[in-house]
Amino acid sequence: MHILGDIGNTETKIFLVSLDNKITKKLTFITKDINQIKLEKLFINFKIDFKKINKILFCSVVPKSFNIIKKFLSKKTKIKCFEVKNLNLKSLIRIKANYKQVGSDRLTNAISLTNSQNNFIILDFG
């Protein structure tokens, strides 16, 4: 199982994804309210077996919230939690800008377009 997350300015969404890429659970909460205690309560209701998690990846535009979630999940799963911006993306996409200055949400949109077998329309309201 994988944990995937999107931390936006308003909302944070966390998904539990099966190995065949199906979303099995979704958790949504207000980003500004996040802290260790709230995460503990949310994940109790999420009913997740942390031993089954083998990868964690987040797309975040709020570094402070990502650090709180990363600390929580790393402690629970003993797995390193990655943020899209911190991955080596040069082999996936080439852009004429500093990757650190481009939002994670924009980078993931661009990466999704590299699949040349399908047509895409990406709507980004962020």
Predicted regions and their residues:
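N-terminal phosphate-binding loop and adjacent alpha-helix
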Residues: I23-I68
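Alpha-helix C-terminal capping segments
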Residues: F43-I48, K76, L113-Q117
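Short beta-strand-loop/turn "lid" adjacent to the catalytic site in phosphate-handling enzymes
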Residues: D49-V102
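Phosphate-binding/catalytic loop of phosphoryl-transfer enzymes
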Residues: K80, L92-G126
